Design a protein with these regions (language model features):
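Outer-membrane beta-barrel "beta-signal"
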Residues: 72, 148, 184, 202-212
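Generic hydrophobic/packing signal
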Residues: 11, 89-91, 181-183, 205-207
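Outer-membrane pore/translocation modules
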Residues: 18-181, 191, 198-199
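Short amphipathic alpha-helical segments
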Residues: 2-3, 98-100, 207-212
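Cleavable N-terminal export/targeting peptides
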Residues: 1-22
Length: 212
């Protein structure tokens, strides 16, 4: 029985690790994200099983400023079962917020932090994340998002995996504070790609993750 549980846990870890903010020890990860408000790029290295550290660039298209930050992520807790995995992360960053696109603002300190949590089997997924950002005169904002989805088929290791998801996004400071985004996720090997469309504000969503 224990051998079967260990095999199942190892398989879940190998198939689900691609989307994780903490990779395997010694691994590098590149993450790109673009949603209704901002676009970002993160390159991080995983020095230990419970932490990654990287550099993140974020461009806020609505308010014409960018954030350049050091970005650590801590894996606080991981749960394994015979057919599921759950994770709890703390993430944050500190750096500089700078004006772009003729915004006359000056450089100011930016700091942010939040939590991420997810639970999934080979066919079901639920996730939550939030972040509070303080960037001087540029922004003081909170966001949170809940995501749920399912896999229309269960692939084996090395196959192309497909997920259909819905994300509910809440940003209290925005005029459209709550929005809905249906999306599709594909991953195979070290590459994960997500594409969707925000039905509330008519904006595309595109994310990718690549592990080295």
């Amino acid at each position: 029985m224990w051998k079967a549980l260990l095999i199942a846990a190892a398989y879940l870890a190998s198939t689900m690790a691609i989307g994780r903010p903490v990779s395997y020890v010694g691994g590098w990860t590149v993450i790109g994200e673009s949603d209704r408000q901002s676009s970002s790029a993160l390159v991080h290295y995983t020095p230990s099983p419970n932490m990654s550290l990287g550099f993140r660039t974020e461009v806020n298209r609505d308010s014409d400023f960018a954030i350049y930050s050091v970005h650590p992520t801590l894996l606080a807790k991981r749960w394994f079962g015979a057919d599921y995995q759950g994770n709890l992360y703390f993430h944050g960053g500190i750096g500089v917020a700078s004006s772009i696109h003729k915004n006359p603002g000056s450089d100011q300190m930016a700091i942010y932090g939040g939590v991420m949590a997810d639970w999934e089997t080979r066919s079901l997924f639920v996730g939550y994340r939030n972040r509070y950002l303080e960037a001087g005169d540029y922004a003081s904002q909170f966001m949170q998002a809940f995501r749920a989805g399912f896999a229309p088929y269960e692939g084996d290791s090395g196959d192309l995996h497909t997920w259909l998801m819905l994300e509910i996004d809440h940003r209290p400071s925005d005029p459209d504070s709550v929005t809905a985004t249906p999306l599709v996720r594909f991953f195979k090997g070290p590459l994960l790609v997500e594409a969707g469309y925000n039905l509330t504000v008519n904006q595309p969503l595109f994310n990718f993750t690549y592990r080295f």
